[in-house]
Curated annotation (Swiss-Prot):
GO terms of molecular function: ATP binding; ATP-dependent protein folding chaperone; unfolded protein binding
The organism's place on the tree of life at top rank: Bacteria
Similarity annotation: Belongs to the heat shock protein 70 family.
Compositional bias (Acidic residues): 624-637
Origin species: Oleidesulfovibrio alaskensis (strain ATCC BAA-1058 / DSM 17464 / G20) (Desulfovibrio alaskensis)
Protein name, per record: Chaperone protein DnaK
Length: 637
């Protein structure tokens, strides 16, 4: 079995860890970063992922996709998607089944497909670090993700060429990293406020057991919303001062987004920052510059209600866990937004204790995912992880009522069955409408799927016995079956994301991703071949220049011809042709190198001979200089 990597597939940034022996290790990207922006950019020639995609977003806003996680498993007409559309520079459209897709230059991409592009980059970075192929991963999701969102995440992994061994909740992964090697029993709260989602989980950690007691959250609350508040403020201030509305200028909005994100980070450590964006726009009077000072107090006022929205889920999670805030031993902060002083203060006020800041909030989730990978691979022993399902599961029954079979915060994996009957005489079939949610009426909850149990023998209403069974696996993904106990006839459904991809679509996307990986590999080979050729041309031309007229005309012409042939090959895209022309010039340039070496040797010998001649003359002069005229007196006896 190869290495199982742990991936935190984040809204804003993603991170990948691996177990090296018993220690989790962060895999840095080629740019040297420990996290990679979850951004994909499409240009005329190529597809960009990560830092390079984020850097070109200002000049290419309509074709740069960020925060795609917010669209995972959602319908295009969902209220949250409608809100996101208002601020998104890229186009969000309805895909098959009415699910939310993004459209780039006429091509529709599912959120799973775009996420797969980010995962493929993380996979490639891990392979470059390990020097071996990576095929298995543990991927994290927000604890409050529903079944559709979990299934979409798993599909993204498959498209990227990864066998997703486990989908694990982000707060659970964080607690696994926090509780790793800890023996003392503690009740901990993991407060996870990231780029796009918020989760709160109450867990018991200790003696190598991590048990989730309860979880709650908001899958549409995070740093992106905080950034948007700052952007709105900057747009309004600029409009007030200059009478120009920047909200209609997508390029300006992208610059404002970058500035808002930076200002928000700066104000976690400073009391005031200046946002300075020269040439943000222009009118008939000339270019306009944006210069606005933003204080921490002003930022806190802008986002106070967003921070307040995190408190109610905390109350619900504690209630479900049967604990009071004072019974929680530690509050662990996860997600970049928890660096904000106002967030830390709200958490401290609610739980009555200072939060634990010992873990890196950007990396702790992927670290936990890698530990889970180590557990699955058998490299990490004696660690038991007990997770829960975040939302209640059930079916629609007579009168449009939602009948729960599995309550929220039930430990998974789990299986539960309940017997139902028919509502009419001689009813030949029953429709099973599978749902997830907490509302009493079916219409207010989320549909996971529908299926029919047919062939029920004619009988008065209330007589047939239909057993409905729910089975949730360790990934939190649902299977449902219905069985007529009278005939033994059974029908089952594996719930795939109702707004997700069919098996055929996934297989096609897997093939497309593999083809794209081959294209990327060929592109890399072409760049490397051109670089090698360019380097050889430079050294060859320099050697020709150094030798000047001392080179035979035939050899000089041969080298010049082969150099020209290589330059022509470099203009094309045939890697083999470039390599062949490079080899031919390399062989010819060996003769050139020999000539140059011989010239240098001759020069060195000439210099040595001249030095030797000078030495002899010097020695003679030196001897002559040693002769001294002396006065003397002749003594006679």
């Amino acid at each position: 079995m190869g290495k199982i990597i742990g991936i935190d597939l984040g809204t804003t940034n993603s991170c990948v860890y691996i177990m090296e022996g018993k220690d989790p290790k962060c895999i840095t990207n080629p740019e040297g970063g420990r996290t990679t922006p979850s951004v994909v950019g499409f240009t005329d020639k190529e597809r960009l992922v990560g830092d390079i995609a984020k850097r070109q977003a200002v000049t290419n806003p309509e074709r740069t996709v960020f925060a795609i996680k917010r669209l995972m498993g959602r319908k295009a007409d969902a209220p949250e998607v409608a809100r996101w559309k208002e601020h998104s520079p890229y186009q969000i459209v309805a895909g098959p089944n009415g699910d939310a897709y993004v459209e780039i230059e006429g091509r529709k991409y599912s959120p799973a497909e775009v996420s797969a592009m980010v995962l493929a980059k993380l996979k490639a970075d891990a392979e470059a670090y390990l020097g071996e192929t990576v095929t298995e991963a543990v991927i994290t999701v927000p604890a409050y993700f529903n079944d559709s969102q979990r299934q979409s995440t798993k599909d993204a992994g498959r498209i990227a060429g990864l066998d997703v061994k486990r989908i694990i909740n982000e707060p659970t992964a964080a607690s696994l990293a926090y509780g790793f090697d800890k023996k003392a029993n503690e009740k901990i709260a993991v407060f996870d406020l990231g780029g796009g989602t918020f989760d709160i989980s109450i867990l018991e950690v200790g003696d190598n057991v991590v048990e989730v007691r309860a979880t709650n959250g908001d899958t549409f609350l995070g740093g992106e919303d905080f950034d948007q508040r700052v952007i709105n403020y900057l747009v309004e201030e600029f409009r007030r001062e200059n009478g120009i509305d920047l909200s209609r200028d997508r390029m300006a909005l992208q610059r404002l987004k970058e500035a808002a994100e930076k200002a928000k980070k700066d104000l976690s450590t400073s009391m005031e920052t200046e946002i300075n964006l020269p040439f943000i726009t222009a009118d008939q009077t000339g270019p306009k510059h944006l210069m606005i000072k933003l204080s921490r107090a002003k930022l806190e006022k802008l986002v106070e209600d967003l921070v307040e929205r995190t408190i109610e889920p905390c109350r619900k999670a504690l209630s479900d866990a049967g604990l009071s805030a004072s019974e929680v031993d530690e509050v662990v902060l996860v997600g970049g937004m928890t660096r904000m002083p106002l967030v830390q203060k709200k958490v401290a006020d609610f739980f009555g204790k200072e939060p634990n800041r010992s873990m890196n909030p950007d990396e702790v989730v992927s670290m936990g995912a890698a530990i889970q990978g180590g557990i699955l691979a058998g490299d990490v022993k004696d660690v038991l992880l007990l997770d829960v399902t975040p939302l209640s599961l059930g079916i629609e029954t007579l009168g449009g009522v939602f009948t729960r079979l599995i309550e929220r915060n039930t430990t998974i994996p789990t299986k539960k069955s309940q017997t139902f009957t028919t509502a009419a005489d001689n009813q030949p079939s029953v429709s099973i409408h599978v749902m997830q949610g907490e509302r009493p009426m079916a219409s207010d909850n989320m549909t996971l799927g529908r299926f029919e149990l047919t062939g029920i023998p004619a009988a008065p209403r209330g007589m047939p016995q239909i057993e409905v069974s729910f089975d949730i696996d360790a990934n939190g993904i649902v299977n449902v079956s219905a069985k007529d106990l009278g005939t033994g006839k059974e029908q089952s459904i594996r719930i795939t994301a109702s707004s997700g991809l069919s098996e055929d679509e996934i297989q096609n996307l897997v093939k497309e991703a593999e083809a794209h990986a081959d294209e990327d590999k060929k592109k890399k080979e072409l760049i490397e071949a051109r670089n090698q050729a360019d380097s050889l041309i430079y050294t060859t031309e320099k050697s020709l220049s150094d030798l000047g007229d001392k080179l035979e005309a035939d050899l000089k012409k041969e080298i010049e011809d082969k150099t020209a042939a290589l330059k022509t090959a470099m203009e094309g895209s045939d890697v083999d042709a470039i390599k062949k022309a490079t080899d031919e010039l390399s062989q010819a340039s060996h003769k050139l190198a020999e000539k140059l070496y011989a010239q240098q040797q001759a020069g060195a010998q000439g210099a040595a001979g001249a030095e030797a001649g000078a030495g002899d003359a010097g020695a003679k002069a030196s001897q002559d200089e040693d002769v001294v005229d002396a006065d003397y007196t002749e003594v006679k006896n």
